[in-house]
């Protein structure tokens, strides 16, 4: 969504936001003034979305190298929410900040690359997305496997998942579940290579196993989960499935992590 210039009626009511009274209710100016008073240099800021009297909330984007932060100001009540986003993840953390001072402190910590777990200790009201934390701590592989193994049976065949988890070459890859199919990747985030194999349900016949960049007609039928896993392993690229970490412990591979 492209920002639109703010008009004279875009400002917030200083009676609702007394901390914006020196700025005539302008949240952009208020963030800049508060940051300067705290000795903080904010990343580039700009209006986010429409900026007019009908817009609720009124939003500001702070574009740091770590990811875009969106600060939302509710128009009719004093409520400031902060969303910290990462590419391909979306929200990495969210918070309802009590004051502009707290908002700027959060933004400063984010753009200075303060780890998410440390930010959570400093600001207990910060809600951190588990995958974002796992990715930052080098636990994305074990987290993804735990997540996939916990999925209900109507989402993915659990026997197939457990058979894949028991296979070291597959356990070293990131599992991806989509439309009841189980695929794999060597990266925790998109773009995922189409050279890795996938097992797709084939009704009562079991699975069809093949590379994601192949036509379904070229896929190999597999009657049971063990047979499907054997086919998946045979189709791994030569550089795929190498042990970079274990789902039973931490790993340091964060390839393609922004």
Tell where the protein language model's regions lie, with residue ranges:
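Ampiphathic alpha-helical segments that act as solvent-exposed interaction surfaces
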Residues: 91-122, 209-258
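Structural alpha-beta junctions
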Residues: 36-40, 66, 204, 238
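A compositionally biased, intrinsically disordered/low-complexity signal enriched
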Residues: 31, 48, 56-60, 93-100, ...
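Low-complexity, compositionally biased segments
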Residues: 55, 59, 81, 189, ...
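Intrinsically disordered, low-complexity regulatory segments enriched in Ser/Thr/Pro
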Residues: 65-106, 186-222
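Negatively charged, low-complexity tracts enriched in Asp/Glu with abundant Ser/Thr
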Residues: 2-61, 116-188
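N-terminal amphipathic/basic-hydrophobic helices that include classical n-h-c signal peptides
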Residues: 1-2, 252
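C-terminal interaction module
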Residues: 155, 159-235
């Amino acid at each position: 969504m492209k920002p639109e210039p703010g008009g004279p009626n875009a400002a917030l009511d200083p009676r609702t936001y007394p901390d914006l009274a020196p700025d005539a209710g302008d949240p952009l100016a208020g963030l800049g003034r508060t940051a300067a008073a705290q000795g903080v240099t904010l990343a580039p800021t700009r209006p986010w979305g429409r900026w007019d009297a009908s817009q609720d909330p009124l939003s500001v984007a702070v574009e740091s190298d770590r990811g875009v932060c969106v600060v939302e100001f509710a128009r009719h009540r004093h409520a400031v929410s902060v969303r910290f986003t990462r590419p391909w993840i979306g929200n990495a953390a969210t918070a309802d900040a009590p004051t502009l001072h707290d908002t700027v402190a959060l933004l400063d910590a984010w753009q200075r690359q303060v780890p998410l777990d440390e930010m959570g200790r400093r600001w207990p009201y910060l809600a951190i997305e588990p995958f974002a934390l796992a990715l930052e701590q080098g636990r994305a592989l074990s987290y993804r496997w735990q997540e996939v193994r916990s999925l209900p049976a109507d989402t993915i065949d659990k026997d197939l998942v457990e058979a894949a988890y028991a296979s070291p070459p597959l356990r070293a890859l990131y599992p991806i579940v989509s439309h009841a199919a189980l695929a794999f990747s060597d990266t925790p985030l998109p773009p995922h290579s189409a050279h890795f194999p996938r097992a797709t349900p084939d009704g009562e016949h079991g699975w069809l196993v093949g590379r994601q960049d192949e036509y379904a007609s070229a896929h190999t039928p597999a009657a049971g989960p063990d047979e499907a896993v054997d086919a998946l392993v045979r189709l791994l690229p030569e550089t795929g499935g190498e042990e970079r970490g274990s789902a039973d412990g931490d790993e340091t591979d964060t390839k393609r992590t922004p």
